[in-house]
Amino acid sequence: MSEQLVAVGVLSRPHGIKGEIRLIRYTDSIDVFLGEVFLQKSNSLPKKAEIISSRIHQGVALVCFKGFSDRSAVEVLRGQTLLVSRSFLPEIESNESYLCDLLGFSVVLDNTDEVIGKLEYVSFPGGQELWSIITPEGKEVLLPAIPEFVLEVDTNAQLIRINPPKGLLELYK
């Protein structure tokens, strides 16, 4: 597959009886959730799919796929990652970045420049952005990605400066 695919969400659970499924989205824009997309189970290859409708209901994104017309049919999609071609992503400002572009960046403490590790993964449990940072020793450090803790992202240097809450890093030693 030559085009670059970007994860934009994870399918959660069916909604109603007409084939809609909840989507935990990684993007604010709902526009990317129409037309040709790709679905991926765990570590398998992505498969093409088509979203025929998308909407926001009580703050939750709901999508409906072609060929999935009822609740039991869409149940098989639960837990799959929704991917789109990078070319479908909306333009962003020069001072913004897509999360997928930050993966692999070095994460350092703001006050000492000590390297904590590399940004490995981003998840959204309970709607809160949570960064998984892998230390040089191979340990995982989880950091809530809020402005108080993430001070600077330098895309040119591929560097993220953080000021974690007191005691957080000690939990992982």
From Swiss-Prot:
Subunit structure: Binds ribosomal protein uS19.
Family: Belongs to the RimM family.
Biological process annotations from GO: ribosomal small subunit biogenesis; rRNA processing
Entry GO MF terms: ribosome binding
Comment field on protein domains: The PRC barrel domain binds ribosomal protein uS19.
Primary location: cytoplasm
Annotated compartments: Cytoplasm
GO cellular component: cytoplasm; ribosome
Occurrences of domain PRC barrel (ranges): 94-168
Species name: Lawsonia intracellularis (strain PHE/MN1-00)
Protein name: Ribosome maturation factor RimM
Function of the protein: An accessory protein needed during the final step in the assembly of 30S ribosomal subunit, possibly for assembly of the head region. Essential for efficient processing of 16S rRNA. May be needed both before and after RbfA during the maturation of 16S rRNA. It has affinity for free ribosomal 30S subunits but not for 70S ribosomes.
Gene from which the chain derives: rimM
Lineage: Bacteria, Pseudomonadati, Thermodesulfobacteriota, Desulfovibrionia, Desulfovibrionales
Keywords (A to Z) from UniProt: Chaperone, Cytoplasm, Ribosome biogenesis, rRNA processing
